[in-house]
UniProtKB/Swiss-Prot annotation:
InterPro entries: HemK-like, N5-glutamine_MTase, SAM-dependent_MTases_sf, Small_mtfrase_dom. The gene is mtq1. The lineage of its organism: Eukaryota, Fungi, Dikarya, Ascomycota, Taphrinomycotina. It is found in: Mitochondrion. Its main location: mitochondrion. It comes from Schizosaccharomyces pombe (strain 972 / ATCC 24843). The keyword Transferase applies. Substrate binds at N200, P201, P202, Y203. This is Probable MRF1 mitochondrial N(5)-glutamine methyltransferase mtq1. Disulfide bonds: none annotated. One of its GO terms (molecular function) is protein-glutamine N-methyltransferase activity. It catalyses: L-glutaminyl-[peptide chain release factor] + S-adenosyl-L-methionine = N(5)-methyl-L-glutaminyl-[peptide chain release factor] + S-adenosyl-L-homocysteine + H(+).
Amino acid sequence: MRLPRITKFALYRENPCLLPLYHATRDPSLAKREWTWICKELKLLYPEISKHGLRKKIVNACQLRARNYPLQYILKSQPFGNIKIDCQQGVLIPRWETEEWVERVVDKLNRLERLKPLKILDLCTGSGCISSFVLANLRVPHTIEAVDVSKKALKLAVKNCDRAIAHGTVGKINFHQIDVLNEHERVESLLQTSHVLLCNPPYISDDDFAAQTDISVRKYEPKLALLAKNGGNEFYYKFSQYIKRMLQRNAKDFVPLSLIVFEIGSTHQAKIVKSLFDDTNWQANIEQDGAHQDRVVIITRKDRRLIDI
């Protein structure tokens, strides 16, 4: 959408900083909203700075946005449910779609009556947004094992989860740097003692990355956290192999894994994941997000159901 020159002039006259924000948003009302967020959040980020110094940071932020630099990296945070997640370049920005399904799952887990801790595995934790929300909101005693291949992501996840623990009272967390596609023994060892697997893996194919993602995602967010081989399905195939092998190697009665939640990116992908787990041991259901797009596959053990789906 091309903004009429007279509208550009009106924006500039109202506030020169709105013009670079418009270049990022392509929407005058969104540009004004971002201006409000930037002013508010930077003032909170730098409470001791002078008015002149704050103004320089605000102008610099607007110039960065004109180059499609993500707002969350500028403001260094992103709301996620009732908590705030610190953000930095090199670590995937939490999405509202993830926030939605995590809230639903935690709400269902909170209905459980358990005395022994629930063991939760968060594979591909990234910023730690999923683990942080669980720590802050799950009232059932629990221990989380958070896994990622990226040192940078894990360092940020530790920071976010430490802050979340202050909100909650019954959770603990451990962190593991693991290449989940290749270190199968370490992953299977964690799976073997977990009741719940929560996973938002890389799931975008090379073709979809080039054709469907925003320029800000392509330019600035880590491809390591976004792209997957095999049409975007590499992680789902690998994890299903791990789980099936683990169940074959161990007596089912001694494997507590009862609930698996995978985020997915399309209906086609959801059907693939569902087909990997629709068997005698598991029941898989597809759920949509608030935009009515298929977003998660929720998989439960038929002989050991934790929650109803």
